[in-house]
């Protein structure tokens, strides 16, 4: 004891007589209780206003899923050389540049100088641009153009996930998948900026541990970088765990519009046309056909391994201040902010060909999103 804590001899005698000396000494010498500093928020979290009067529309897209993964393959039909590039599941926007690079490699060895590209979504446009970069005269033929493609429905997170069934792929395919992911990331990184609508944002995986994250995140450390585990108090949501990382967010309407303009400005031609059978392809003037029809390959080329995976979104009014992505493990929902609105998902309905919103799915997404943003724990 020292300073003001010193007890005088007279006070000691007095306290001893009262039986209080031991208590006084022990109290003076006891360590002071240390209060842990408050947990600081990881960042500012502008909150999404989930309200029925803010719903702009609902969106439905059919992901072209193949358990064995996407197809990048050469084919010869009649008098045409055909290079296939389809079947990306939920990763079409993400992988578009990478698989198109692989497809272009196959096409360049054939010696043509002009080609037809079937499809005008993310994969078709990336393929068309890469062929233009190589000096090809390129014409796109497509049933639907932006903003009416499946790629326009994509919420936009750069994420090579839900592309295949891990029990149905070969080691050779997986190596091709990893290469395509790396290639695609490299192309997108050069497009970061408002013109193409590509930006880097924080992703928050609530209800996840690092081990729970998709395998591709662990396979591509040079892309995903640091994985940070957060604790309650660092975020304003009623979730026990959270892992955060950074990825690109692709504002698909902005991106697809810019890509289509680039293609046309470099001399590319686009025709709206629906091919009902392969025989119609043989009438095209181009000797080389790049098939980027997605789910259309089920009908046009008879690929019965393809199946639709229906995805449904609720689109809220835009909130420009929301600049991060949330994915909630227990509830199976996600939020991604785009310029045209806040995208609330998610759903995966395998084998469902309907493009009509399912009211039960809408109610589930809305209810779980409302609970999450109001601070209730996820299911």
Where are these regions (language model features)?
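Active-site substrate-recognition segment that forms the wall
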Residues: 34-78, 87, 92-101, 121-136, ...
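Glycine-rich active-site loop/strand segments that organize a redox cofactor
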Residues: 144-180, 231-233
């Amino acid at each position: 004891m020292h300073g003001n804590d010193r007890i005088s001899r007279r006070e000691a005698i007095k306290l001893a007589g009262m039986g209080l000396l031991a208590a006084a000494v022990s109290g003076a010498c006891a360590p002071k209780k240390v209060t842990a500093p408050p947990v600081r928020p990881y960042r500012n979290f502008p909150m999404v206003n989930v309200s029925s009067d803010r719903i702009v529309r609902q969106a439905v897209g059919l992901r072209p899923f193949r358990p064995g993964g996407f197809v990048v393959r050469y084919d010869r039909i009649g008098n045409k050389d055909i290079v296939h590039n389809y079947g990306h599941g939920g990763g079409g926007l993400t992988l578009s540049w990478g698989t198109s690079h692989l497809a272009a490699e196959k096409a360049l060895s054939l010696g043509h100088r002009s080609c037809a590209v079937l499809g005008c979504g993310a994969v078709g446009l990336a393929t068309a641009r890469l062929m233009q970069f190589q000096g090809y005269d390129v014409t796109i033929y497509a049933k639907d153009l932006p903003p009416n493609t499946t790629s326009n429905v994509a919420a936009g997170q750069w994420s090579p996930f839900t592309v295949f069934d891990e029990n149905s792929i070969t080691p050779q395919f997986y190596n091709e998948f990893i290469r395509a992911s790396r290639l695609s990331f490299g192309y997108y990184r050069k497009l970061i900026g408002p013109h193409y609508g590509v930006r880097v944002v924080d992703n928050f995986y609530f209800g996840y541990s690092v081990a729970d994250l998709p395998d591709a995140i662990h396979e591509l450390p040079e892309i995903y970088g640091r994985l940070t585990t957060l604790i309650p108090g660092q975020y304003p949501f009623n979730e026990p765990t959270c892992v955060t990382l950074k990825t690109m967010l692709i504002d698909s309407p902005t991106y697809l519009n810019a890509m289509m303009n680039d293609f046309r400005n470099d001399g590319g031609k686009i025709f709206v046309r629906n091919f009902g059978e392969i025989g119609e392809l043989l009438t095209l003037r181009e000797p080389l056909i790049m098939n980027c029809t997605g789910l259309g390959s089920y009908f046009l080329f008879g690929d019965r391994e393809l199946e639709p995976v229906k995805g449904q979104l609720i689109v809220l009014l835009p909130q420009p201040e929301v600049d991060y992505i949330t994915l909630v493990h227990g509830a199976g929902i996600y939020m991604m902010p785009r310029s045209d609105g806040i995208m609330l998902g998610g759903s995966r309905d395998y084998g469902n060909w309907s493009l009509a919103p399912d009211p039960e799915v809408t109610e589930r997404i809305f209810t779980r999103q409302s609970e999450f943003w109001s601070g209730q724990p996820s299911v």
